[in-house]
Regions:
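Secretory pathway targeting signatures of secreted, lumenal, and periplasmic proteins
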Residues: 16-93, 137-139
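A short, hydrophobic, proline-anchored segment that marks a local hinge/packing element in signaling
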Residues: 150-156
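Surface-exposed amphipathic alpha-helical segments
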Residues: 162-203
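Short coil-to-beta-strand
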Residues: 157-161
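Well-ordered, non-membrane alpha-helical segments in soluble/globular domains
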Residues: 90-99, 188-195
């Protein structure tokens, strides 16, 4: 039986504002040749959540920024001569469908794929990203929250997956809050750059 993969974790110096909310090892999907296992770490930006909760007097106590990593393993192991990079074209469509399903499971609506791009991680690795738009209904709030979400898949000897989601508008603007706290004033571009910084930190 194959050993489950080690977790893909954020370095300690990237943890500011983030906390681990879940860690698990699970079968992600089945292929004709066997099962794909994943060691998952899910992070939430607690600093943003706390700032929003405080300024709404507890009216909105909800995850509005998330980041997750998964390192994949194969059961049984890949046969000799088959590298993880050779499997990625098969895995990527499965990962996209799985991520869309998970966004729906989080209660998000209007989930749709809106684009793709590539970025470089270090000198030798490129990651192919898929962008999604979604809406968080935010139970208990008077307005909804539009989100931009991402899925990235790449190899570095193993197959890695990273996902994220964040608001597309400053939270202070969306909820008409007078906020000096930086977490509530960040734009979609700010969030996007932080997401890419987290990706690069995984190298």
């Amino acid at each position: 039986m194959a050993t489950d993969p080690d977790p893909l974790e954020l370095p300690a110096d990237e943890w500011e504002g983030w906390t681990v909310v879940d860690g698990s090892v699970e079968t992600l999907f089945e292929l004709p040749t066997g099962r794909v296992r994943g060691t998952v770490r899910q992070y939430e930006n607690e600093r943003t959540r706390e700032a929003l909760r405080e300024l709404t007097d507890g009216g909105i106590d909800h995850t509005v920024r998330f980041f997750a990593t998964t390192r994949l393993g194969f059961e049984p192991p890949l046969p000799p001569g088959t590298t993880p990079a050779m499997i990625v074209p098969v895995l990527r469509p499965e990962a996209r469908q799985s991520f869309a399903d998970r966004l729906h499971d989080r209660g998000l609506t209007n989930v749709e794929q809106t684009g793709r791009e590539r970025i470089r991680l270090g000198e030798d690795t490129r990651i192919r990203l898929t962008r999604y738009a979604a809406v968080d209904p935010l139970p208990g709030a008077e307005v909804e929250l539009p989100l931009e979400c991402w899925l990235g898949v790449w190899t570095d000897g193993t197959v890695n997956v990273a996902t994220s989601g964040y608001p597309t508008v400053p939270l202070a603007t969306q909820f008409d809050l007078e906020a000096d706290d930086q977490p509530l004033r960040k734009s979609a571009n700010d969030y996007r750059e932080e997401f890419r910084s987290l990706l690069r930190a995984l190298q």
